[in-house]
């Protein structure tokens, strides 16, 4: 079977979508399918890190070459407009990927099935191309973009337009993969017909990442790391406020943001002049692992109200490296962190986050330990299990 993945982000980029779709490609190839990936050219900082760690190896990993009977993954990258942080974000950037994508999907060998992922404009391009070629497609619904836009305070007309595009993409899909029950519920409300829930998983390496990442602080105190997307609906600026409040009790501490996103400039403005806060542009997934592995604790957040069903994948990535998490937000992620002693869960409150930083830095917080955290991810959020389940959904689109 020939499967085409249409995605603006793919491994070795350090995004949840890139890691999720890389795992799906490996699972499909391991089952004997041929996978063709239409994606974007890497951001310069990610490409540099990938060259240093060996991008050829990263792509070999993505090929899923597991021996006899394995398929092949072919990754085709095309130029795309990125913002100043290196992200493909905003509708000008989206169009720079989606319009050429339509032509790419209409050319070449006819696939048996196409897999699309957000944003909705990509889903629209996929639906149009698949209708013309009479090919079924699967929509991998990791989030509801219109809900995130509403939470970010985007004007109502824009939110309604995005919701219309999202509904169009979902209604045309033969099957939809949702990463949580909450996402599945909203997908059905927007018109999805056949939805399967496959929770996100992450790979737990045999050993935690080693080596010192470029730019890692040489300080005597704790280092808190926020690695991943920076956006208004995630409210990452609250960690700057909390760090500033707890600074005197943390000694020679550092707070480091490693990533990109629509909220990057605003975060930089908020952090300007705050001692001990650094911002590092997006790095490769391997380099992000090294940042998380060496951190005292990693940080994740979610603004409550309308998007509470989201589960930040950066939590799982941190635990896979044996590092505790401070999660400020609602939902299942908070329950997991609290009930399984995976760090500290609190509300999106400056004082509570400040206390969590002090508790983890001093060893006062309940913590299952490095081995315990990694074991929890293996048992509950294995990427091997999730990618196999997602691959089964993709194959079922032909049934």
Residue ranges of each PLM-predicted region?
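Membrane-proximal helix-turn-helix segments that form the acceptor-binding/catalytic region
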Residues: 124, 128-132, 157-178
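Carbohydrate-associated surface elements
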Residues: 41, 182, 201
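Nucleotide-sugar-dependent
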Residues: 234, 284-291, 296-319, 326-336
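A charged, aromatic-enriched C-terminal amphipathic alpha-helix characteristic of glycosyltransferases
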Residues: 348, 364-395
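Conserved donor-binding/catalytic core segment of Leloir-type glycosyltransferases
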Residues: 215-247, 256
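Conserved acidic donor-binding segment of nucleotide-sugar-dependent glycosyltransferases
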Residues: 339-351, 358-365
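N-terminal subdomain of nucleotide-sugar transferases
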Residues: 1-68, 246-248, 384, 399
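Nucleotide-activated donor-binding/catalytic signature segment of Leloir-type glycosyltransferases, i.e.
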Residues: 221, 250, 265-289
């Amino acid at each position: 079977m020939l499967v085409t993945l249409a995605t603006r982000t793919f491994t070795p980029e350090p995004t949840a979508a890139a890691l999720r779709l890389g795992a799906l490609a490996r699972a499909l190839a391991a089952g004997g399918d041929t996978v063709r990936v239409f994606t974007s050219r890497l951001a310069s900082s990610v490409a540099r890190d990938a060259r240093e760690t060996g991008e050829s190896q990263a792509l070999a990993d993505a090929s899923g070459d597991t021996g006899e009977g394995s398929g092949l993954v072919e990754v085709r990258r095309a130029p795309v407009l990125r913002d100043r942080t290196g992200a493909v974000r905003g509708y000008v950037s989206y169009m720079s990927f989606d319009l050429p994508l339509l032509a790419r999907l209409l050319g070449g060998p006819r696939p048996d099935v196409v897999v699309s992922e957000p944003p909705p404009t990509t889903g629209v391009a996929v639906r149009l191309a698949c209708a013309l070629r009479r090919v079924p497609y699967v929509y991998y619904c990791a989030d509801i973009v219109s809900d995130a836009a509403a939470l970010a305070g985007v004007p109502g007309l824009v939110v309604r337009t995005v919701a219309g595009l999202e509904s169009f993409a979902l209604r045309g899909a033969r099957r939809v993969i949702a990463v949580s029950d909450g996402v599945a519920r909203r997908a059905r409300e927007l018109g999805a017909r056949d939805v399967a829930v496959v929770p996100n998983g992450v790979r737990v390496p045999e050993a935690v990442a080693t080596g010192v990442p470029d730019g890692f602080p040489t300080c005597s105190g704790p280092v808190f790391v926020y690695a991943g997307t920076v956006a208004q609906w995630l409210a990452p600026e609250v960690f700057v406020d909390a760090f500033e409040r707890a600074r005197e009790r943390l000694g020679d501490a550092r707070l480091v943001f490693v990533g990109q996103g629509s909220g990057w400039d605003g975060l930089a403005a908020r952090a300007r002049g705050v001692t001990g806060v650094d911002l590092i542009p997006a790095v490769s997934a391997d380099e992000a692992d090294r940042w998380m592995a060496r951190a005292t604790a990693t940080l994740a957040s979610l603004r409550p109200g309308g998007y509470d069903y989201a589960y930040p994948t950066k939590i799982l990535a941190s635990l896979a490296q044996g590092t505790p998490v401070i999660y400020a937000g609602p939902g299942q992620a908070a329950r997991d962190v609290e009930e399984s002693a995976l760090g500290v869960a609190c509300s999106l409150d400056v004082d509570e986050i400040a206390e969590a930083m002090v508790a983890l830095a001093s060893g006062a917080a309940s913590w299952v330990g490095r081995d315990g955290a990694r074991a929890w991810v293996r048992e509950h959020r294995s990427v091997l299990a999730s990618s196999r389940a997602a691959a089964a959904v993709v194959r079922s689109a032909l049934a």
